[in-house]
Amino acid sequence: MVAVRGSHLLNPQDFVIEQWCTGLKLAEQTEKSLIDAWYYARDLMNAYPDEMKNATLMLQSGVEMVEILHELNMDAETLLTAMLFPIVANKLTDWESLKEKFGAKITKLLKGVLEMDNIRQLNASHSANALQVDNVRRMLLAMVDDFRCVIIKLAERITFLRDAEHRCAEEDKVLAVKECSYIYAPLANRLGIGQLKWELEDYCFRYLHPEQYRAIAKLLQERRLDREHYIADFVSELSGYLRENIEQVEVYGRPKHIYSIWRKMQKKHLEFSGLYDVRAVRIIVQKLQDCYTALGIVHTQFKHLPKEFDDYVANPKPNGYQSIHTVVLGKGGKPIEVQIRTQQMHDDAELGMAAHWKYKEGNTGSMSAYEEKIAWLRKLLAWQDDITDSGEVLAELRSQVFDDRVYVFTPKGEVVDLPTGSTPLDFAYAIHSEIGHRCIGAKVAGRIVPFTYQLQMGDQIDIITQKNPNPSRDWLNPNLGFTHTAKSRAKIQAWFKKQDRDKNIPAGKELLDNELALLNLSIKQVEPYALPRYNLKNLDDLYAGIGSGDIRLNNLIHFLQSKLIKVTAEEADQEILRHVANKSAVNSQQKSEKNNGCVIVEGVDNLMHHIARCCQPIPGDAIVGYITMGRGISIHRADCEQFLDLQAAHPERVVESIWGENYASGFHINIRIVAGDRNGLLRDITTVLANEKISVLGVSSRADTKKQLATIDMEIELHNVESLSKILARLAKLDDVIEAKRL
């Protein structure tokens, strides 16, 4: 068990800043800056003796914050900012004085940490929507100019919790602890900083649920020595096996955190005795392949529980966490959780995003393994030093990490997540399609803004609507800048398509009537053939499809000609022969179904056939056959455009075909996904296919940067049309996907 620690500088009279700095083994310039800052803070407090009853506590807070951040290997600027933060929070100095003495960078960092207090305005503890709270946390990360502000604030909250009993009244303490539980602990988890996350969680649990906390702590303490001896023996045995096969490996017992134990008990509905990971061991290796070597050794030497295995190396958690988790049975059949990770994975899990700002001066230890990983960050920071008063570098850094998102508020304070560059119309359509259709204006912070205004982080938008929907076609033009997201434009297009139906029906009817007049056909003759072909309910649907261009008129006419017009006597004779052959097809068909189980061609057994590549039909599709020159019969979808052209030219070569009952071969088909261009789109698509056990045979993609659209074509292997419909439906539900269809 790891017990949370209280404030440890209990004898401030004995505290000597110079000795303390020496103990941290800091670079000379960093040490000097911290000493100057400490004396600066002390002198300010001494200047207000009546108001500063908690002066000692404030100085102590600054020192503890520095210690926490130093353990995270934070840089000198971060440490100096932490030392000064208590006097800034208590308004003992002004910004000009700070800027003059400590510089613009430190002043900007201090302002950023203070901005973190705005989280209280969000009142996240009253939100019942988990997604809403998560958006608030993500917005908090993106709002600040420098990630170090977030980490400093987390350190400040930990120092508060360590001494909360002496800092404020009970009611204020409970509110502050809830704030840490709802906002700051999940924030530390999102940043991947395990060292801060577990301490925040355990403190919050101790204050909010003291009885449960004490009960678990007591259970852990009762058999602590026996458990420690058991783990020590297991570690010794396991280390021997591992060192025979892995050059560099470290094995040790892993400390348990009370909150994580309680959470697992609640989640899995277990008693304390039923937990697997009260006894836990961690294996640290240097190379990725050694993780799986170690896993093989562990599973070979000890019986493992398959249901308790998780590979977060191959499938990292959303915050980047990587490790292999497994549970094995040690001596006496006692379960032991084993975690396996590389040193870099371990450092990432403990330091998370703080690793990007690690303090390097005078440090040549194991942290040098991070050099390759953060080289690009160093270049950005060096570039920042060369540019005066420029926020472009940090903006680029934020976009790399947070996928170019902007988080804005509704009038009720709800957070809406949109791509950077979104406009008020994008916001309106994100709320609801009808809000977008009826939008006639927008206010940001009470001020009217144009539709081309690009939303900024933290904007509060009020949409002005009219009674009836009336979107403009100009909104669809990306060059005009009214809309930015593909989803907004798709909703606008859908509205116009629906509204245009009244215009398309008479236009389509006129086009079809003109063509039928040339063929001496009536609409009554055409209706029984045309409606089933396109799966339509009535003639208005047919006219609307022709008028909008969704139904190609020339294809329809070719189809109708093949069904209703016999051009020559020779063709008529051939048609009669085909009908005669069809009369004897039933017995032959039954035989084919039993013996072939594939495609059954009317009246012919065991005839060579192949699937046409132009339309790639699969079981469930309506199909027809076409007699080729020397290659047997090619099987097409009944609505295949290429087949319709062939049929119009040589109708005598067409033979009716159906699927056999036992056709089990895999079919190759092409699908297309059109979506708003975003990071992780291809990963999400392939995940859906993998979950359905669909093989991907080929992928090609292209992007339209102006329209922010991505088009992905894929060749996949399927067995029937039902599974295709299921796949397309799941793909269509993915975020930002506009269309998923078969080609």
Swiss-Prot record:
<feature type="domain" description="ACT">
    <location>
        <begin position="670"/>
        <end position="743"/>
    </location>
</feature>
<dbReference type="GO" id="GO:0015970">
    <property type="term" value="P:guanosine tetraphosphate biosynthetic process"/>
</dbReference>
<keyword id="KW-0547">Nucleotide-binding</keyword>
<comment type="similarity">
    <text>Belongs to the RelA/SpoT family.</text>
</comment>
<protein>
    <recommendedName>
        <fullName>GTP pyrophosphokinase</fullName>
        <ecNumber>2.7.6.5</ecNumber>
    </recommendedName>
</protein>
<keyword id="KW-0342">GTP-binding</keyword>
<dbReference type="InterPro" id="IPR045865">
    <property type="entry name" value="ACT-like_dom_sf"/>
</dbReference>
<keyword id="KW-0418">Kinase</keyword>
<dbReference type="InterPro" id="IPR045600">
    <property type="entry name" value="RelA/SpoT_AH_RIS"/>
</dbReference>
<dbReference type="Pfam" id="PF04607">
    <property type="entry name" value="RelA_SpoT"/>
</dbReference>
<dbReference type="InterPro" id="IPR002912">
    <property type="entry name" value="ACT_dom"/>
</dbReference>
<dbReference type="InterPro" id="IPR004811">
    <property type="entry name" value="RelA/Spo_fam"/>
</dbReference>
<dbReference type="GO" id="GO:0008893">
    <property type="term" value="F:guanosine-3',5'-bis(diphosphate) 3'-diphosphatase activity"/>
</dbReference>
<dbReference type="InterPro" id="IPR012676">
    <property type="entry name" value="TGS-like"/>
</dbReference>
<dbReference type="InterPro" id="IPR006674">
    <property type="entry name" value="HD_domain"/>
</dbReference>
<dbReference type="GO" id="GO:0016301">
    <property type="term" value="F:kinase activity"/>
</dbReference>
<dbReference type="Pfam" id="PF13328">
    <property type="entry name" value="HD_4"/>
</dbReference>
<dbReference type="GO" id="GO:0015969">
    <property type="term" value="P:guanosine tetraphosphate metabolic process"/>
</dbReference>
<dbReference type="GO" id="GO:0042594">
    <property type="term" value="P:response to starvation"/>
</dbReference>
<dbReference type="GO" id="GO:0005524">
    <property type="term" value="F:ATP binding"/>
</dbReference>
<feature type="domain" description="HD">
    <location>
        <begin position="58"/>
        <end position="161"/>
    </location>
</feature>
<keyword id="KW-0808">Transferase</keyword>
<comment type="function">
    <text>In eubacteria ppGpp (guanosine 3'-diphosphate 5'-diphosphate) is a mediator of the stringent response that coordinates a variety of cellular activities in response to changes in nutritional abundance. This enzyme catalyzes the formation of pppGpp which is then hydrolyzed to form ppGpp.</text>
</comment>
<dbReference type="Pfam" id="PF19296">
    <property type="entry name" value="RelA_AH_RIS"/>
</dbReference>
<dbReference type="InterPro" id="IPR007685">
    <property type="entry name" value="RelA_SpoT"/>
</dbReference>
<dbReference type="InterPro" id="IPR033655">
    <property type="entry name" value="TGS_RelA/SpoT"/>
</dbReference>
<comment type="pathway">
    <text>Purine metabolism; ppGpp biosynthesis; ppGpp from GTP: step 1/2.</text>
</comment>
<dbReference type="InterPro" id="IPR043519">
    <property type="entry name" value="NT_sf"/>
</dbReference>
<feature type="domain" description="TGS">
    <location>
        <begin position="404"/>
        <end position="465"/>
    </location>
</feature>
<dbReference type="GO" id="GO:0008728">
    <property type="term" value="F:GTP diphosphokinase activity"/>
</dbReference>
<dbReference type="Pfam" id="PF13291">
    <property type="entry name" value="ACT_4"/>
</dbReference>
<dbReference type="Pfam" id="PF02824">
    <property type="entry name" value="TGS"/>
</dbReference>
<dbReference type="GO" id="GO:0005525">
    <property type="term" value="F:GTP binding"/>
</dbReference>
<dbReference type="InterPro" id="IPR012675">
    <property type="entry name" value="Beta-grasp_dom_sf"/>
</dbReference>
<dbReference type="InterPro" id="IPR004095">
    <property type="entry name" value="TGS"/>
</dbReference>
<keyword id="KW-0067">ATP-binding</keyword>
